[in-house]
């Protein structure tokens, strides 16, 4: 319907729309914003100011809404950024942001670093070459600022596979470098390959910008009810900035997600589910179905004699392919050796690690063949990873739920219409069983404080 929308386009390299300091209560609705005609190096929409010109909260625009807008770069030369999100109390909903791409610099559909939040990013199409969505990544003009209270829900985050043969600089799909209380739920993340970075689709790495923002943290993040597919690798976690002072990465929960097509042969990279560096604390991974070609977990940091330990790590009730190395840390052996040194005291139980060796891992996990596991799903050929009726994996989780992703929660989270478009089937009713007792007593809790907004 772009032909029916009023169109705003910059005649030069400056934003087509920018807010005045302290602006309040503006709604942009049913508008098209085209590429900046004077150059592809800037923002199309500038909400707030990312520089020292916005050095206190009184100057931050707030109560802004971008609703059902079409925002796009030039198909041939792209655009650096769709929306610069340096405001407060801002919603971006129902909008379509495309052709945000660059061969020479990072390009983002939405990025913010000097706005306090809260932010609602819901029901959008976000297409970019660098980082489709990012918080942090530049020094805030406001001392001590951390973008907070973020809800990122039911978005389609992707890029065209045809860009792979072009020269656009591809980095990741979703990145947090400075953020607090973030809820990421019901999204589709897809089509990501190794290019200007190693290939991880989702990146949580606190960055203090060379010591200029040592307060930067990534904490209290919940990632649930998402589908991540057709990517080179999934998560890259780093406890602290390795290039200067920063705060920590901590309290992250990854629950009830479906990951498939995590394939290094198709997309480059290493096909790893989770790379975890320097020992971030209170990470919980539970009830996920993960079909990947690389490691389950790769840990690094510290030395072989004194690895960087991840305190209160939880990995339970997941279905995953073990592949060659499963859970492995730098300089250590697969399984128990890595767990005892990189994840001391970890709650690692009731997982299905298909193709793994039980002698290398804690008890109360299972290690079927990959062929057997494939037979437990409804139809792997059509990516239907529901457990079939009668499978012994039904209601075998520590909480008496099915191990792996809960399809009812996944479909409710992603939305029925989106689920239908994805080809996700309706969930099967549970099969009554008391074969397993709840063994969660005595286990360390996940220590999660989910994003406060929208719940």
Enumerate the predicted regions with their spans.
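Residue-level signal for pocket-adjacent positions within structured domains
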Residues: 3, 78, 105, 128, ...
